[in-house]
Amino acid sequence: MAITVLSNIFTIIPNTPPLTYTAGLYKRTFAGYHNENPSFFATATPATYGSNPATSVQTTIIQEPSSDDGTNFSVQWLGYFKPTTTETYTLFISSDDGSYLWIGANAISGFTTANSTINNGGAHGPVEVSATVSLTAGIYYPIRMQFGEIGGGDVFTFNHSTPTITKTTNVTGKVFYNSITNGL
């Protein structure tokens, strides 16, 4: 943190690391089900990790295909959602099994199942849950999505809509990650 003195007026400027936005979200896949515990992702070792570019028609759907056995794995996506219009957005998660979404400050730290923007937790078949948030065009909003599969079918899909945008999985030009920190 830097402190500048100007005529006995102190201005505190936070020492913020530079952000380098790259299209897509940063994705980590883990062996094991998260058991409705968001801190699972902080202590487990990722089996795979890397970016999910989400930049072409084929990859604009944030969707995790089945693992080899189709059971007992978890996935976390980190990054930023940059709205193209200033509106009320409806965010949707459809999942089988448990999933959560945080957008804004809670996506960075202090995230719990209780303060998630969308809570679609528990072992269940395909269920869609939504939430509405007011977002401003051009602002990078931190976003965190967590999904786990514990048995049966497995699917995770993120959609969004507004009064002027039809419900879509297309996130081209709307999701980014910090390539310096691999996520947020």
Where are these regions (language model features)?
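Interdomain boundary/hinge segments at the C-termini of tandem beta-sandwich modules
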Residues: V5, F10-P14
